[in-house]
Amino acid sequence: MTIGLIGRKVGMTRVFTEDGVSIPVTVLECSPNRVTQVKTLDTDGYQALQVTAGSKKASRVNKPEAGHFAKAGVEAGRGLWEFTLADNEGADIKVGAELSVELFNEINKVDVTGQSKGKGFQGAIKRWNFSMQDATHGNSVSHRAPGSIGQCQTPGRVFKGKKMAGHMGAERVTTQNLEVVRVDIERNLLLVKGAVAGAKNGDVIIKPAVKA
């Protein structure tokens, strides 16, 4: 199954097993996802479900968005996401339908995608976990410097992809094979074992695990 849900990271807590073992979990709020468009091979060249989640103030919805949501007959959400469909999947899902956290009732492992916390401009020590140079023994000013970044006249340049200082974080990060600890249908909550990338209240994409 390739259909997933759009959720929101609430935060982390822990749950206990009957034996008293503490399990760290991330709480994901999965409010019902509304289907805004069903893409087909005939009209779009591929099969996918387009969904929205949450809500957005009417004053914040521009005219193209308003028209798109009105055509689907659903309330405007905070964004639009797509789930590519496999062959013969999702044939019974129509525009306006709702997908709930109940989708994960029979699933043990999930992949969760979020945007990692932005750290701004960082040096090579923090960004790439480089070792620091000597604190003393004649070293000055170069304690947190990355060191050599290349060779001499040959090749006479710095190779692409060289690990150097730069912007860190604020990247799309997928954490794979997270165990589903609990599915709370009444409160639209999904509890997964371990950490998920991103800050609290950040949007996350939850899919059945690919490598499970």
Curated annotation (Swiss-Prot):
Keywords: Methylation, Ribonucleoprotein, Ribosomal protein, RNA-binding, rRNA-binding. Part of the 50S ribosomal subunit. Forms a cluster with proteins L14 and L19. GO terms for molecular function: rRNA binding; structural constituent of ribosome. Pfam families: Ribosomal_L3. One of its GO terms (biological process) is translation. It comes from the Bacteria. Gene3D superfamilies: 3.30.160.810, Translation factors. The modification N5-methylglutamine is found at Q153. This is Large ribosomal subunit protein uL3. Belongs to the universal ribosomal protein uL3 family. InterPro entries: Ribosomal_uL3, Ribosomal_uL3_bac/org-type, Ribosomal_uL3_CS, Transl_B-barrel_sf. One of the primary rRNA binding proteins, it binds directly near the 3'-end of the 23S rRNA, where it nucleates assembly of the 50S subunit. Methylated by PrmB. It comes from Psychromonas ingrahamii (strain DSM 17664 / CCUG 51855 / 37). One of its GO terms (cellular component) is cytosolic large ribosomal subunit.
